[in-house]
Amino acid sequence: MTQRKQSVVQGQHAGKRDYMRFTYCPHCGTKLVLKEIGDEGLIPFCEQCSIPLWDSFTTCIICAVTNEKHEVALLRQGYVSAASYVCVAGVMKPGEAAEEAAVREVGEELGLSVEKLTYIKSYPYDKKEMLMLGYHAEVKKEEFRLSGEVDAAEWVPFEGALEKLREGSIAWQLVKAVISGR
């Protein structure tokens, strides 16, 4: 076995994180082989179904929710972070568009209706094997109607928002981009 093929089999490829790799086809159960596919290199492949099975990661949304008074909604969710505030975030459901997920999560977590939604940027989150799609969700300032998964939420003026978030976190990067107008 070549060094390249061996490293791909072991999941230690090109310095990338070891994402979930398929061993058997989820459609027919056949053991996969490694097949060279264009510029992608060796990819797990089902010869029975004639399909490649790409590395998997979870796609999520994260929203900087703001109102007309230049405030951002910051949440406390103990299961996410005991020490820092966070933004609205959640996993996309099968068949759901990212924009639909963003609107749904703002409604579920804060009980607010999104008036305008703007895509900002994608953020790879290697530690949890996720891709976070960042949005700016604009709402009217109202009382929060929190879901059971949110411990608390508050409206924070733009000027003080970054200091309440963990510096460098995805929430911090997103809020910084939104309040700086990027």
Feature locations, PLM:
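N-terminal leader/linker segments that precede catalytic domains of diphosphate-processing enzymes
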Residues: 1-80, 91-143, 180-182
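A short, flexible beta-alpha/helix-coil linker loop
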Residues: 80-81, 161
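Conserved acetyl-CoA binding element of GNAT-fold acetyltransferases
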Residues: 85-90
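NUDIX/MutT-family hydrolases
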Residues: 145-176
